[in-house]
Every structure is written in C-alpha cells, then in structure tokens.
Amino acid sequence: MSSRSDLKIKRVSLIIFLLSVLVEFCYGGFTSEYVRGSDLPDDMPLDSDVFEVPPGPNSPQQVHVTQGNHEGNGVIISWVTPVKPGSKTVQYWCENEKSRKQAEATVNTYRFFNYTSGYIHHCLIDDLEFDTKYYYEIGSGKWSRRFWFFIPPKSGPDVPYTFGLIGDLGQTYDSNSTLSHYEMNPGKGQAVLFVGDLSYADRYPNHDNNRWDTWGRFVERSVAYQPWIWTAGNHEIDFVPDIGEIEPFKPFMNRYHTPHKASGSISPLWYSIKRASAYIIVMSCYSSYGIYTPQYKWLEKELQGVNRTETPWLIVLVHSPFYSSYVHHYMEGETLRVMYEQWFVKYKVDVVFAGHVHAYERSERVSNIAYNIVNGLCEPISDESAPIYITIGDGGNSEGLLTDMMQPQPKYSAFREASFGHGLLEIKNRTHAYFSWNRNQDGNAVAADSVWLLNRFWRAQKKTWLDAF
C-alpha cells in the first residue's frame, strides 16, 4: 500500500513537472479568433470634452508627473500655462500633514514651424517619503489646481507593485476607450510604463503641435495622479527639414522630461529607474546604439550594475519589438536585437515591452544569439535565460490596427491578437509576477491573455525541479 502511494505521488509530481515545463516552454502558439472591426479610428474633434481647457484665463493644463530620480522618491511635475508664465511654485504636502512645502519650476517655450508653445513648467521634487501619498497644488488664486500622487515603497526584493502598460496611444475615440478601460480596471496600475508614440501630432500637416496640447489635456486625468514612465517612439522624432525643423524630438523633449541624469545617461531618451522591486531600463530605438556609442556604453555599464537582490525584476522598455509575427514593421527591430539580445540573455532580463506594431503579441522565452554569418543557426530557440517579449502597441491611434500576420504562426509567438487594449504587470514578490492583457471590448476584469512570470534571476539561484515552471 505504501509503495503504491509513493508511486502515485511520484506520478502526480511528474505530471505537475511536465505541465509546468509546458507552460513556459511549449511551442503551441495561439492566434486569437477574436476579430475587431477594421475601420480606421477617427481622431476626436478639437471640441471634444476630453480636450477641454480648464476654466480660468491662464490656468495650468496638461499636468503630468513622472519619476524624478533613480531611487523612486522623487517626482517631476510638469504643466503648461497658455498665456504667460504665471506662478512657478508647486506647493506640496503629505496626506496627514497641514504644513506645506514648496518648490520652484523652470519654464521654457519652443517654436515648431508656425507654432509657438505655451509656457512649459518642470519642477523636480526630491527626497520625498517612501510609501506616502502627497497632494500638490499649482497655479495661483482661485484658478489654482490640486492633484495628488503616491511615492512607492522603498526598493526591496519582495515589494509588490503593479504597472500599467500602454503604447501607441494617440487621441482617437479608441484611444479614449483604452485609457478609460485602464482607469476602470479594478487592478489598475500604480504607475504606467509607456512604450512610445504619444500624440501622433506628426500625422497632421506640418506636424501640427496644437495636437500635442490636446493630447496633454486628454491624458491629464491619469498622468496628473500617477507617474507615466516615458519611452520615445518614431512618432516623437518630428524631424522635418522641408519646413526647417532639423532638431529631432524637439516637442517631446521640451514637454516630457525624464530623470536621465540620475542614472548617468547623457540623453533624456535612455535612462533607468528603480521602483519598488523593479529595475526599469528605457532604451531609444531612434538614437545611435551601435558599438561604442553613448547609449551602448551606458547600457553596458547599466546592466552590469543592477543589484538583483534588491530589485529582482529587470524590465526593458523599447519602442520597436525584437520579435514580431505581424507583416507590417516585420524585423524593423532586428539590428537592435542583434546588438543587445545577447546582453539581455546574459543578464537575465525578465521581460521586454515594446510598441510600434499596432496589435498585441506575447512571445515564448526564446533567443537567437548563436547565429553568425556562416553557421546558419538563424532560428530562435527555447532559452530559459531569455526574456519574454511583449508587444503592446495597441493603444488606439489613428493609423489603426495591423491585422496581417505571418502564416503559419512562428514557434516563437505564444499569443497574438489584433485588438486595442492595455496591459498590467503585477509583481507579487521576488519570484513571481502576473501579466495580463485586456482588450477594450472585454469587461474590466476580463483578461484576453495572461501569463505567470517566474523571475529569471531567482530561478537561476534555485534550480530545483519545482522551479522548471
């Protein structure tokens, strides 16, 4: 009887082990049968209520916050005043305190062709208390405006934290649906990882920068209250020599600051931050990244210095995906992949998020680092040290969805669907995180795709049969 019980236990254990292996390493790629209408999304009109200018002759608008330092206890608060600079002061205070502190913003404007921006304010507030809610007030008199944000807990290996994932948003009716869907999600993130392509102002004649203003007012309802971590996409380049605009990224870099100097970067377009139990590296696909370039040297040093015992979850944000099975934009990220995939495997990056492709896709854990020009080893293979690659360029922009997919579905593709939506990454502890993707047409609590992630660093530290999944 005892031997039978032992045999039964062994069989059950073996089944669990095999199923666990299949969860992460099977090549049963799935293409969703859900079909969304193929009509191109329409941009919302200028008189849409989501673009409404706040009352008052010079009220702050387009308010947004992002992380302000490397450690996580700083913020950059930004806003625009349309007529004159107005007050540069930010008043801020903890939730349970009456006394207020204040900080001063810098102010700048820029010109783009025949457009002149409003007065753009950026205020860095540093050395705030971890795990604390802060209120802040900008403007003056009866036209001042009040918002709040949360400083995350201090970094540690088992600090739970939830990130929202949005990319290629634009300002269409579908964009509004994506943002509303994210806001109403019961598990809404505490910060958003934004993987590039913000306003799509470059789709208008002469890159009409008024559409940067409408976009800033549109997303204010979220980004004024929780930090969005910015990645620059191709629609932020705004390089138009024909009309005399030869400074790449001019509107983006004037409007959206990043804490790049805190991580030793020389450019706002690539940088890193720590937030709770995550270490996030933002890369620029549209800046030089070849060997010996500043971005290359910075990333090489950056990956070597990540302390995975403090921040075990290593996340990379890029705009152009390394792996995609959609026909449009196919292999546009190939040179970046060839350059850096071996590093991502070596340093056990957990997940790479990208946009650019206007659809959703999740990869298996694969790598293609054995290839050279003569050996012919050009197929991606299963690799337990490799990250999962998730493309989430499905925010709703006016270019529409990409529905033409490679057939048959490549083995590296685990799930794909041409729909608009958003993602959530829920970090549970040092070993486990849960990713889910919600299409706009689902109920708020319904995930169209989901996967448990086992941390690559801790998996390597504890190689037992149970760790196989």
UniProtKB/Swiss-Prot annotation:
Broadest EC class assigned to this enzyme: hydrolase
InterPro entries named in the record: Calcineurin-like_PHP_ApaH, FN3_dom, Metallo-depent_PP-like, MPP_PAP, PPA-like, Purple_acid_Pase-like_N, Purple_acid_Pase_N, Purple_acid_PPase_C_dom
Record keyword ATP-binding present: no
GO cellular component, one term: extracellular region
Tissue expression pattern: Expressed in roots, stems, leaves, flowers and siliques.
Protein keywords: Disulfide bond, Glycoprotein, Hydrolase, Iron, Metal-binding, Secreted, Signal, Zinc
EC number: 3.1.3.2
Induction line: Slightly by phosphate deprivation.
Binding site for Fe cation: D168, D197, Y200, H358
A Pfam family that the UniProt record links to this protein: Metallophos_C
Active-site positions on this chain: H329
Biological process according to GO: cellular response to phosphate starvation
Cofactor binding: number and manner: Binds 1 Fe cation per subunit. Binds 1 zinc ion per subunit.
Main localization category: secreted
Matching PANTHER family: ACID PHOSPHATASE RELATED, FE(3+)-ZN(2+) PURPLE ACID PHOSPHATASE 12
Assembly mode: Homodimer; disulfide-linked.
Family named by the database record: Belongs to the metallophosphoesterase superfamily. Purple acid phosphatase family.
Protein name: Fe(3+)-Zn(2+) purple acid phosphatase 12
